[in-house]
C-alpha cells in the first residue's frame, strides 16, 4: 500500500480545470473545534472563518495514468471524494484523458502548467489539436472560468513555436481570435499572474 502511495506521489498529473467546489458542509462542521484567538469571537468573524475553511479552490488534473488525491487539511473534514471524469474527444491525443478535482491557490498558473503538460505528454502540435485541447478545458468548466482558461491558453501558445497543420494555417489566427474577442469579462478579479 505504501509503495502505491509513493508511486502516486511521484506521478505528475497535468491540471485541467479550476472552479470553487464546497469540500465540506455546514452540517458536518464541528464549531467547537475551531481555533479561537480571542475568548469571544463575533458571529460575523466566526462565519467568515467557517466559510474560508469550507470552500477551497479546486482544479482538475488530467492524465493517462493514476491521479494523486488532494492533500489533506487538518482544519476541516473533506467532503465526499470527487470521482474522475474520462474525457471523450475526436482528437486521439486527448481522448481517454482523465480529469480529477484538485486544490489550487493560483488557477491561472495551474491552467498553464496543465496545458503545458498535456502538450508535452500527448505531443500536441497542430492547430486542430490545440483547439481540441482548449475545447476540452472549456467543456469541463463553468462559463465564469472560460475567460481565465482562454488567457492561460493564449499565454501557453505564445511561448510555443508556431506550428502549422497540414493545410498551412498558423496558430496565430487562433490566438488573435481569442485575444481580440474575450469570452467574458466577469473574472478579472480572479485572474492571477506571476508578474503581480
From Swiss-Prot:
Main location: nucleus
Consequence of gene loss (knockout): No visible phenotype under normal growth conditions.
Gene Ontology terms: cellular component: nucleus
Keywords: Nucleus, Repressor, Transcription, Transcription regulation
Domain OVATE: 100-159
Source superkingdom: Eukaryota
Keyword Zinc found: no
Pfam family, one: Ovate
GO BP field: negative regulation of DNA-templated transcription
Tissue: Expressed in roots, cauline leaves, shoots, stems, flower buds and siliques.
Coiled coil: none
Subcellular location: Nucleus
Biological role: Transcriptional repressor that may regulate multiple aspects of plant growth and development through the regulation of BEL1-LIKE (BLH) and KNOX TALE (KNAT) homeodomain transcription factors.
Miscellaneous field: Plants over-expressing OFP10 have no visible phenotype.
Protein name stated in the entry: Transcription repressor OFP10
Organism the protein comes from: Arabidopsis thaliana
The gene coding this protein: OFP10
Amino acid at each position: 500500500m505504501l509503495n502505491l502511495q509513493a508511486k502516486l506521489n511521484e506521478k505528475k498529473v497535468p491540471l485541467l480545470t479550476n472552479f470553487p467546489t464546497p469540500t465540506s458542509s455546514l452540517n458536518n462542521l464541528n464549531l467547537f473545534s475551531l481555533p479561537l484567538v480571542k475568548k469571544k469571537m463575533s458571529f460575523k468573524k466566526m462565519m467568515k472563518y467557517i466559510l474560508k475553511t469550507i470552500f477551497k479552490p479546486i482544479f482538475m488534473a488530467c492524465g493517462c495514468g493514476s491521479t494523486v488525491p488532494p492533500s489533506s487539511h487538518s482544519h476541516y473534514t473533506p467532503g465526499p471524494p470527487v470521482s474522475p471524469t474520462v474525457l471523450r474527444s475526436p482528437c486521439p491525443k486527448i481522448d481517454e484523458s482523465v480529469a480529477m478535482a484538485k486544490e489550487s491557490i493560483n488557477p491561472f498558473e495551474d491552467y498553464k502548467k496543465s496545458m503545458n503538460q498535456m502538450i508535452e505528454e500527448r505531443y500536441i502540435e497542430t492547430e486542430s489539436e490545440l483547439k481540441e485541447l482548449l475545447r476540452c478545458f472549456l467543456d469541463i468548466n463553468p462559463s465564469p472560468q472560460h475567460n481565465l482558461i482562454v488567457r492561460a491558453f493564449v499565454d501557453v501558445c505564445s511561448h510555443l513555436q508556431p506550428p502549422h497543420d497540414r493545410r498551412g494555417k498558423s496558430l496565430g489566427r487562433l490566438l488573435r481570435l481569442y485575444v481580440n474577442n474575450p469570452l467574458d469579462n466577469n473574472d478579472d478579479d480572479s485572474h492571477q499572474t506571476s508578474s503581480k
